Design a protein with these regions (language model features):
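Proteolytic processing hotspots in large secreted/extracellular or virion-associated proteins
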Residues: 1-117
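Generic cytosolic/nucleocytoplasmic N-terminal low-complexity/intrinsically disordered segments
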Residues: 10, 32, 48-49, 118, ...
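Proteolytic cleavage junctions
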Residues: 68, 75-174
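Feature responds to low-complexity, polar/acidic, surface-exposed segments characteristic
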Residues: 140-165, 173-197, 201-220
Length: 220
């Protein structure tokens, strides 16, 4: 609690907690303030326990032998621990250290969330940061998170030596952009305004059905 008090008092905008060089959690000032208020009279404990036995076949298929961790946050007071499962609208940034296996494309690496019954959610806005050697994502709750991989589909034959190959695979695997055919992406072809706006909309999670009319004739 004293550490949180000091961080908030000094208006520390970002605070990073590293656990065994395997998991890092970055906490912003607003979240620090919330945790500071919640820790009155006690302490806040952050844990990242490695998960060796995944709960379901779905989770095993998604994560395979890649790392998975049970992230938890508890309030400790008087020897009693109370789980904090949600951040009430705030988020934290998480890094899961990982070195891609031979043949894995970094654009197809994801963070995956595994719920209490073993159902998997692929976190679309996660990504692999080569400079950090980690999969990075944001979340507002604590549970089991791991590193997942989706095989490239479709298999574009014209991007192997392209400078943006990993970025193309990232965008295609998350459904932001599609190829010009089942096997080609045409990476040097210009992007229309419609393609650009569509990709931005998909990235933002917009439902096109909510918009009955559009101002651009080339946006579909």
């Amino acid at each position: 609690a004293q550490t949180l008090d000091l961080l908030v008092k000094e208006n520390v905008r970002q605070f990073t907690v590293a656990i065994d060089h395997l998991v890092s959690v970055n906490i912003g000032l607003d979240t620090l303030k919330q945790l500071d208020a919640a820790s009155a009279g006690g302490d806040i404990i952050l844990r990242a326990n490695k998960v060796d036995a995944l709960r379901s076949t779905e989770a095993k298929v998604a994560i395979e032998t890649r790392p998975a961790y049970d992230l938890s946050l508890v309030y400790l007071s008087g020897g009693k621990e109370t789980p904090i499962t949600s951040l009430n609208g705030h988020t934290i940034s998480v890094r899961l250290s990982y070195t891609p296996a031979k043949g894995e494309q970094t654009g197809n690496l994801y963070a995956v969330y595994v719920d209490d019954v073993g159902k998997v959610e692929w976190i679309t806005k996660s990504s692999y940061d080569a400079s950090l050697k980690a999969v990075v994502f944001e979340t507002g709750h604590f549970s089991v998170y791991g590193v997942g991989y989706k095989n490239p589909a479709p298999a574009f034959t014209d991007i192997h030596n392209h400078w943006a190959a990993d970025n193309i695979l990232f965008a295609a695997s998350r459904g932001l952009l599609s190829g010009t055919s089942d096997t080609t992406f045409s990476p040097n072809t210009g992007m229309t305004r419609g393609m650009f706006v569509t990709a931005l909309g998909r990235l933002a999670g917009i439902n096109p059905d909510s918009y009955k009319t559009g101002k651009f004739t080339d946006v579909k």
